[in-house]
Amino acid sequence: MLKIKTKKQGAELTSIQCDGKEMLFDGKTFWNRQSPILFPIVGRIKDSKTEIEGQIYEMSQHGFARDMEFNQIEENHYVLTYNEETLKKYPYKFELHVIYQIIEDTLQVEYQVKNIDNKKIYFGLGGHPAFSCDYSTGQYEIVFDEKEDKIKFLKLKNGLIDTEKANNILEN
């Protein structure tokens, strides 16, 4: 049986239990998050600054959604609506909905970004769940739905992709 817990801060998953076993990282060591939502950017931007429509905006790694209090619409349905604070970092009017549902034995996470502005909006969106794995058992593997071509490992320099250095880490 699958059970989840969430919180309003960042609309973040705090627990995924399968038959009583916790599957999500506890957030106590190494990293103080468990499953942050990355919006309106994924990753870093150079010098934490971007130019939009001729104006400079500062935004930290992965954007601001993970650090904001969402409104809870119903159990496991959260919404973040633009406000004075978000407009200082991101000049677009939006609603970000995060909906968690358990369907049979599967957790489904649905993200909806609604443009409530009178212009196009641009954004990146991602989930960053950290799973609890006991690597000492050797019971884990990554399985792809279909054969993958080469996957490149991109090296980072100051948190940004160093385009001069990339290595193939998976072939066939």
Language model feature labels by segment:
Residues 55-104:
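Extended, loop-rich substrate-binding clefts of extracytoplasmic carbohydrate-active enzymes
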Residues 15-17, 119-125:
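Short, hydrophobic/aromatic beta-strand segments
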Residues 13, 76-78, 107-109:
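Hydrophobic residues embedded in beta-strands of well-ordered beta-sheets
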Residues 2, 18, 57, 63, ...:
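Acidic/His-leaning functional-site neighborhoods
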Residues 120-122, 130-172:
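Active-site/ligand-binding surface loops and adjacent short beta/alpha elements
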Residues 1-52, 56:
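Beta-strand-rich N-terminal accessory domains
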Residues 10, 44, 64-66, 92-94, ...:
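Residues that act as N-cap/strand-start positions at coil-to-secondary-structure junctions
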Residues 4-6, 100, 107-116:
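Short, well-ordered beta-strand segments enriched in hydrophobic/aromatic residues
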